[in-house]
């Protein structure tokens, strides 16, 4: 038996659970005194970012500033030094030497750094209750599950947390990116992971089962027939007859659009 724990199952895994191949249980009870993260989708505005970071700084907290590309981090550092000189930023990304990265993370843990400027390497494994503000640069470039995981880095204490998903002020977003941001903004209550995963499956498709990239048996037999075969196999395994051959109950009908009778002229 294998127990898998996830905040947002990927579409293919979720589809396996919904179709009965895997069992699914939801943990919907939030920790005591946990507050939902307030989420805002906004065009990039230096004034908004300054106010958000200063509010967190003056209440004794810390902030994350996440960019999708390493190339943007140094520019972000210069922007913060010029726009919010009251806070002390530090940079972290996956191409740094291990010792340098460890030093930066240790400084952030010890509250010697106010703002951690990083890529999405911080999306999992961090539990810093004093970090309760998140700024996402170019949030339209992140996937829905990534957005949700990154938002989960804040609000891990008893204080209200705030997430700002910034987009280019002079660029129109494509429909998919706009939909992702709208979904995350609307699902700002606690325990929304399953709802986020369901929306993610709806946007991206469910992998080889229902997505655009179908292959193998699914493509050959079609979605409807494959689902029927899958349901039959699952039912048979649940009944304890996992090794038996699945009976061939299919009666194919062939329609060629022409008469197959012997013509009278031939007789």
What are the language-model segments listed below?
Residues 1-182, 195, 242:
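Inter-lobe coupling/hinge segments of SF2-like helicase ATPases
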């Amino acid at each position: 038996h294998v127990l898998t724990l996830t905040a947002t199952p990927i579409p293919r895994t979720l589809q396996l659970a919904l179709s009965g191949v895997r069992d699914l249980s939801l943990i919907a009870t939030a920790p005591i005194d946990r507050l939902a993260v307030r989420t805002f989708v906004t065009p990039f505005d230096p004034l908004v970012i300054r106010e958000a970071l200063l509010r967190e700084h003056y209440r004794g907290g810390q902030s994350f500033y996440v960019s999708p590309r390493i190339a943007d981090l140094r520019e972000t550092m210069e922007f913060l030094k010029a726009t919010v000189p009251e806070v002390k930023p530090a940079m972290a990304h996956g191409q740094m030497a291990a010792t340098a990265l460890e030093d930066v993370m240790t400084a952030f843990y010890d509250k010697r750094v106010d703002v951690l400027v990083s890529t999405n390497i911080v999306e999992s494994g961090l539990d810093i209750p004093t970090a309760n503000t998140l700024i996402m640069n170019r949030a339209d470039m992140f996937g829905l599950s990534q957005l949700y995981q990154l938002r989960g880095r804040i609000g891990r204490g008893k204080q209200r947390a705030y997430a700002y998903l910034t987009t280019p002020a002079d660029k129109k977003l494509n429909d998919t990116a706009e939909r992702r941001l709208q979904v995350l903004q609307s699902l700002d209550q606690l325990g929304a992971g399953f709802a986020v995963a369901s929306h993610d499956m709806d946007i991206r498709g469910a992998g080889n089962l229902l997505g655009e990239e179908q292959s193998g048996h699914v493509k050959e037999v079609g979605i409807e027939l494959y689902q029927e075969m899958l349901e039959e196999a699952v039912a048979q395994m649940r009944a304890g007859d996992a090794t038996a051959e699945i009976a061939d109950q299919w009666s194919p009908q062939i329609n060629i659009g022409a008469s197959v009778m012997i013509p009278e002229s031939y007789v």
